[in-house]
Curated annotation (Swiss-Prot):
Protein name: Cytochrome c oxidase subunit 2
Cofactor note: Binds a dinuclear copper A center per subunit.
Chain's role: Component of the cytochrome c oxidase, the last enzyme in the mitochondrial electron transport chain which drives oxidative phosphorylation. The respiratory chain contains 3 multisubunit complexes succinate dehydrogenase (complex II, CII), ubiquinol-cytochrome c oxidoreductase (cytochrome b-c1 complex, complex III, CIII) and cytochrome c oxidase (complex IV, CIV), that cooperate to transfer electrons derived from NADH and succinate to molecular oxygen, creating an electrochemical gradient over the inner membrane that drives transmembrane transport and the ATP synthase.
InterPro entries, alphabetized: CcO_II, CcO_II-like_C, CcO_II_C, Copper_CuA, Cupredoxin, Cyt_c_oxidase_su2, Cyt_c_oxidase_su2_TM_dom, Cyt_c_oxidase_su2_TM_sf
């Protein structure tokens, strides 16, 4: 969960966010190395006799270097990116499917694998919050899923564009009216994870939070029974 004055990414709570952080660190390292090399060459060229060389002189080694180097950098950036994109999109034998539908300005969740459960999830007003509950993030009815098992979330919208997002899990998918988008969702631990609609969708866009609770499997099965 984010906190005040936070400069870093949120702690990874699932395999998708771990991939996102790895890719971020990988690209950041390449960027720092490129910056150092370019700075070194710039300082060298402006402070040594290299600046007095004939600019029309052909230097085949340099031409080869500034052709091959960018290609290698792009390859080193692209390969991890493609891997991460694949893992973020592919769903492997999900234990459960949940449909999330965006409305102005709340979410509806529907469970249909062997059960028929549907409920709306509204933000709790500040004056009604319990002590310790996060402001503008807590809802009256959380989405619940089993921890440690992959869940498929199918996302759509009823009226305008929305976006279903939980930063600590590294997931963000657009909710488009008339279209179904899916994403794999898994957590590495039990807990409550918060997000918000990340697509401007009207006057109350800022008051459309997402709260997902990951519980042990036996607790989740008990919750399913209680909701029927």
């Amino acid at each position: 969960m984010p906190h005040a004055s936070q400069l870093s990414l949120q702690e990874a709570m699932g395999p998708t966010m771990e991939e996102v952080i790895f890719l971020h660190d990988h690209v950041l390292l390449l960027t720092c190395l490129m910056t150092m090399v370019i700075t070194m060459f710039t300082l060298t060229a402006t402070t040594t006799a290299l600046t007095h060389n004939d600019p029309t002189e052909e230097v085949e080694q340099l031409e080869a270097a500034w052709t091959v180097a960018p290609i290698m950098i792009l390859i080193l950036t692209a390969l991890p990116s493609v891997r991460s994109l694949y893992l973020m999109e592919e769903v492997f034998n999900p234990y459960l499917t949940i449909k999330a539908t965006g409305h102005q300005w709340y979410w509806n969740y529907e469970y249909s694998d062997g059960v028929k459960i549907s409920f709306d999830s509204y933000m709790i007003q500040t004056k009604d919050l319990q002590n310790g509950s996060p402001r503008l993030l807590e809802v009256d009815h959380r989405m619940v899923m089993p921890a440690g098992l992959q869940t498929r979330v199918v996302v759509t919208a009823e009226d305008v564009l929305h976006s279903w997002t939980i930063p600590s899990l590294g997931v963000k998918v657009d909710a488009v009216p008339g279209r179904l988008n899916q994403l794999p969702l898994a957590t590495s631990r039990v807990g409550v994870f918060y997000g918000q609609c990340s697509e401007i969708c009207g006057a109350n866009h800022s008051f459309m939070p997402i709260a997902m609770e990951a519980t042990p499997l036996h607790h989740f099965e008990q919750w399913l029974i209680s909701e029927q």
